[in-house]
């Protein structure tokens, strides 16, 4: 389904009752073909969605609420357009469910169907809100660098690495990631963490490259996959993982993770800006 046919940028009608048909899937294939991915994926990973505006009625009509987390596998054929996700979650507000498990099972069934793959769902009830973490991405900050730049469209030629020197292992972070919604043009603000083993990447060039997304239009997942592939091709690391955490919009934040080696799922701890 084409993003232009999604609810983005259109007048909003909020559903009075639960409605799974509100979910609008968008195939990943189109954006991946633009990146040269036409067969096996050169990475694996997950898109972590956090939903902070989920509420429903119990069997007696009393409102209930929870924070929901969805783990969408990167190999799923579809993503879900974010405004449609918001409208879908909003449709729960005046609908009755017998239990928290019933809500979770419904979410898992519907979102898995839209994505075309099994999606894991976690719900955190209010009495466990104190357990939710907040911390910044770990790593050496690239933003400490004082530099000039004037490139605001993705330019992989900014990337380089010391190919003749011994490999290193580094974790680098930046809070200066910005891209833009391809339908509405609204800015998406994010932080990005890059962990790699291989020839040392030039830090100034990497920061300029991250900044170069500032005028780029692309969904969160697509931007992270482009970052991953550009670093992989230009710098040739032996191991690479890219994790971005984008700020919240419409009660949802999206946090894509891509890697080419086995490692634990990153912590789903929201940053201060989230």
UniProtKB/Swiss-Prot annotation:
GO terms for cellular component: cytoplasm. GO terms for biological process: queuosine biosynthetic process; tRNA modification. One of its GO terms (molecular function) is preQ1 synthase activity. It is an enzyme of class 1 (oxidoreductase). The keyword Hydrolase does not apply. Its EC number is 1.7.1.13. Substrate binds at residues 80-82, 220-221. It catalyses: 7-aminomethyl-7-carbaguanine + 2 NADP(+) = 7-cyano-7-deazaguanine + 2 NADPH + 3 H(+). Pathway: tRNA modification; tRNA-queuosine biosynthesis. Keywords: Cytoplasm, NADP, Oxidoreductase, Queuosine biosynthesis. It comes from the Bacteria. NADPH binds at residues 82-83, 249-250. The active site is at 181 (thioimide intermediate), 188 (proton donor). It is found in: Cytoplasm. Belongs to the GTP cyclohydrolase I family. QueF type 2 subfamily. Catalyzes the NADPH-dependent reduction of 7-cyano-7-deazaguanine (preQ0) to 7-aminomethyl-7-deazaguanine (preQ1). Homodimer. This is NADPH-dependent 7-cyano-7-deazaguanine reductase. The gene is queF.
């Amino acid at each position: 389904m084409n993003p232009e046919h999604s609810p983005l940028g259109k007048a909003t009608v909020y559903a009075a009752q639960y409605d799974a048909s509100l979910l609008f899937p968008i195939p990943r294939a189109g954006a991946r073909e633009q990146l040269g991915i036409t067969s096996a994926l050169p990475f694996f990973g997950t898109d972590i969605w956090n939903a902070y505006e989920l509420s429903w009625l119990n069997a007696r009509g009393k409102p209930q609420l929870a924070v929901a987390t969805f783990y969408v596998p990167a190999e799923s054929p579809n993503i879900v357009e974010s405004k449609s996700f918001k409208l879908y979650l909003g449709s729960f507000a005046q609908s009755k469910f017998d239990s928290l498990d019933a809500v979770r099972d419904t979410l898992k069934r519907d979102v898995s169907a839209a994505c075309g793959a099994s999606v894991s769902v976690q719900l955190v009830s209010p009495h466990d809100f104190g357990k939710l973490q907040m911390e910044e991405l770990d790593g050496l900050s690239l933003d400490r660098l004082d530099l000039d730049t004037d490139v605001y469209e993705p330019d992989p030629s900014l990337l380089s690495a010391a190919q003749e020197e011994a490999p290193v292992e580094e974790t680098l972070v930046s809070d200066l990631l910005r891209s833009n919604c391809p339908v509405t043009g609204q800015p998406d603000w994010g932080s990005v963490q890059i962990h790699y083993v291989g020839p040392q990447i030039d830090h100034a060039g990497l920061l300029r490259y991250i900044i170069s997304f500032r005028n780029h239009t692309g969904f969160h997942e697509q931007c992270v996959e482009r970052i991953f592939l550009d670093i992989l091709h230009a710098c040739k690391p032996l191991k690479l993982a890219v994790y971005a955490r984008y700020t919240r919009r419409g009660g949802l934040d999206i946090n894509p993770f891509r890697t080419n080696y086995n490692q634990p799922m990153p912590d789903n701890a929201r940053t201060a800006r989230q």
